[in-house]
Amino acid sequence: MSTVPTLPGITSQMVQTDRLNVHVLSCGPEEGTAVLFVHGNVSSATYWEETMLALPDGYRGLAVDLRGYGDTEALPINGATGMADFAADVRSVVETLGVGKHHIVGHSMGGGVVMLYAINHAADLLSITLVDPVSPYGYGGSKGANGAMVYDDGAPSGINPEFVTLLASGERGLENPMSPRNVLRGFYVKPPFIPAREDALVESMLTTKIGDDHYPGNAVPSTNWPGAAPGDKGVLPAFNRKYFDASGLANIDPKPPILWVRGADDLIVSDYAMFDLAALGHMGAVPGWPGDEECPPQPMLAQTRAVLDNFTANGGSYQEVVIEDAGHSPYLEKPAAFNAAFHKHLNG
């Protein structure tokens, strides 16, 4: 049923909810305590399989494909509500399957989805795990630890168009530096690490639906640097600061414990991220950058830490675990170190 071959022990199924038809991977006993996994951008549930299979006894792993990724029904992604729609889609799976209280885990963009899910469904959560998550103020368009907008239209926003073209064409090779496989090797993980299931992970990336309604979404001309702002459709607008703000995570009640795990050498989510146009402008890779005062690199880690510190000030608790010599996907790169922290968190 899964486009990408699954590991032994992983079950693939389609779950028709009242919102859409969702592809779900699962493992473990049906009566086990559920652990719900949400993948990041340009990937799918495939990325979680090893982590699911490594769950301690008594846990049931469930990983969803978000709309526009993997084998889930590719409903359009609305720029203004896209992240909330992802969270509502995930919730519809929980309700359709009759999942009781559960743990939830989100990677990268999926971390932002989990934040919104927690804001709406905190009482059902046993714990929250954020793995190299997008900032609570999104990716692009914000500055400062408090997530203030850089410009009122969401600029700067954008992605390398060559990567999008190569994704759309199904490129699997290494010839082009922006090929999906090279982006996986250079940014999803820290070189020289190469995942054992690299071919499956590349196939997962290639399930991403391409276009204005999906990835990367549309953009509109802007008088602000670099001349483009997020439009009203697709993924990049959905997680831009213009439309995304999950800082309300600090105020949820009740407050399940939060584990924030990140790779020490993550190039995708950091305070100087390689896909942040402001950082690229600062280093001279995008011309015309207006300077630090107007458009500084987005301090993604500082923003996340500020919201989690507010969560603590409001009576919650979180732990930040930094995994050395790992990039954006420590659960793939350093599974023993990741699972040690993750399983301890699950077991309370």
Predicted segments, located by residue:
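Conserved HGGG/HGGXW glycine-rich cap/lid loop of the alpha/beta-hydrolase fold
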Residues: 20-79, 93
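The conserved beta1-alpha1 loop
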Residues: 36-40, 107, 262
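Alpha/beta-hydrolase
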Residues: 148-303
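Active-site loop/oxyanion-hole signature of alpha/beta-hydrolase fold enzymes
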Residues: 17-18, 63-109, 119-120, 135, ...
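Catalytic histidine-centered segment of alpha/beta-hydrolase-like enzymes
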Residues: 287-295, 326-335
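Alpha/beta-hydrolase fold catalytic core
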Residues: 1-35, 56-59, 99-100, 154-158, ...
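Active-site nucleophile loop of the alpha/beta-hydrolase fold
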Residues: 129-139
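Short glycine-enriched nucleophile-adjacent loop
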Residues: 111-122, 128
